[in-house]
């Protein structure tokens, strides 16, 4: 039986979360760490499983790192989580004492504790391009963005009117969706540093062109070394 299926059943969590628990060292057998979700193994009673994830998904670890790096205090802040998905960002925001988090995505799969949290307002089956119709101007203290299969450049202007003056925009920069097909290898892992730097500069320029001021950017925690090197970028609305 696959290891991720065993972990999923024993913890009562999704298969994706089970895989992340395995990859982050949460499973061992008689002292040996098992870190391959696809490992075919018998359900051994000596299999030690610990849910190592502090948040609903690994996105929460990325968000926590960014908040700490930029010294962002979100206590009593009103936030919008764009690309909420499994709830990692949202989970981190509410645990850091946000007043309210509007969570938006095409397919939200939150754990029960987020679904029942009164601070969380869910906008499921909702396209990011509709944010201007959904929310009033100057509503949010912070907008966080974690999207895939789309460039950030065309979306940034949508967020500007929704953020209060001196409010923040925190983007997760994913090079595989920003460098263009020419620089995207079949593996999907972008290693061309010049292409990555150029794409990063383009995203920053797009934000500055609509009135944001860049505060800085930082790498996300290197949880999986074989994946694309993501960065978080912080902007302030002037």
Residue ranges and their predicted role:
Residues 153-168:
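A short glycine-rich, Lys/Arg-flanked "PGG" loop and its adjoining helix->strand segment in the class I
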Residues 75-85:
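Conserved class I S-adenosyl-L-methionine
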Residues 1-43:
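A basic, amphipathic helix-loop patch mediating RNA/tRNA/ribosome contacts
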Residues 86-97:
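Conserved SAM-binding loop of SAM-dependent methyltransferases across substrates and taxa
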Residues 58-75:
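Conserved alpha-helix/loop element of class I SAM-dependent methyltransferases that forms part
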Residues 222-238:
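Core SAM-dependent methyltransferase catalytic element
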Residues 104-152:
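S-adenosyl-L-methionine
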Residues 166-179:
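Conserved beta-strand signature within the Rossmann-like core of class I S-adenosyl-L-methionine
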């Amino acid at each position: 039986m696959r290891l991720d299926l065993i972990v999923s059943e024993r913890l009562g969590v999704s298969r994706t979360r089970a895989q992340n628990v395995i990859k982050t060292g949460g499973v061992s057998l008689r002292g040996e760490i098992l870190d391959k979700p696809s490992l075919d193994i018998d359900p051994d009673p000596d299999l030690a499983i610990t849910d190592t994830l502090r948040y609903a998904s690994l996105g929460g670890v990325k968000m926590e790192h960014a908040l700490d790096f930029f010294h962002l205090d979100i206590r009593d802040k009103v936030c919008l989580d764009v690309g909420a998905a499994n709830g990692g960002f949202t989970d981190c925001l509410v645990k850091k004492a946000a007043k309210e988090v509007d969570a938006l995505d095409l397919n939200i799969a939150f754990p029960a504790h987020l679904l029942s949290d009164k601070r969380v307002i869910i906008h499921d089956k909702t396209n990011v391009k509709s944010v201007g119709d959904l929310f009033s101007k100057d509503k949010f203290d912070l907008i966080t963005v974690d999207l895939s299969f789309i460039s950030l450049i065309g979306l940034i202007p949508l967020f500007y009117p929704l953020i209060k003056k001196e409010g923040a925009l925190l983007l997760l920069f994913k090079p595989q969706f920003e460098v263009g097909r020419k620089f995207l290898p079949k593996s999907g892992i972008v290693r061309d540093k010049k292409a990555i730097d150029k794409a990063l500069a383009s995203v920053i320029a797009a934000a500055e062109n609509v009135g944001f001021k860049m505060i800085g950017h930082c790498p996300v925690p290197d949880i999986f070394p074989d994946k694309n090197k993501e960065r978080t970028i912080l902007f302030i609305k002037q």
